[in-house]
Every structure is written in structure tokens, then in C-alpha cells.
Amino acid sequence: MNPRLDYLREKTSLLTTSPGVYQMKDEGGNIIYIGKAKNLRNRVSSYFARTPNHTPKVASMVANVYDYDFIVTHSEYEALVLECSMIKQHSPKYNILLKDDKG
């Protein structure tokens, strides 16, 4: 059992199925990753699945997540625009690292 992951999994069960943007935070509360989702509950819970199938960089990010916040949007397009704006504003560590893999 991992109390940190148990907490994150439990918190995802309370998420909405609406589109939105999520902000993964490290132990100090710093934003380390920003992502968008058409279904916040499904997307965020996929990071904390009991049998994850993550790339090494995503696994590294998940290992450093201690909490997350989210913002509900009216549409996927609004989530995309907000995600882009927030990434430019915060320059989260893992958005930059994961971008390198997308060539």
C-alpha cells in the first residue's frame, strides 16, 4: 500500500467527467505538469491506475505527484486554449521533458 497513491486515487473518484485542465503538483506544491482532458476523471485516474503502463518519463512524473488541482471548462477547445496558456505561464518541468519525446 502506498498512502500517497491511495489518496490520489480516492481524490480522482470525486472528479467530474467534464472537460478541463489539470495541474499535477509535487511535494512542495509546485506545478510539475499541466494537461487537458475531455473527461477529467478518466484522464487523471489513468495516471494512478493500479497496473499502469507508462513510459519512463511519465512514470517519473507520477512518482513525484503528491496532489493535483483542476479547472473545469465548457469544451475541449476551451481546455486546449487554457492548457496552452498555463504551460506558457508556469513552464512545468514535465511538460518540457515530455515534449522532447514528441519530436
Protein language model regions, located:
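Acidic, glycine-enriched active-site microenvironments
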Residues: 1-103
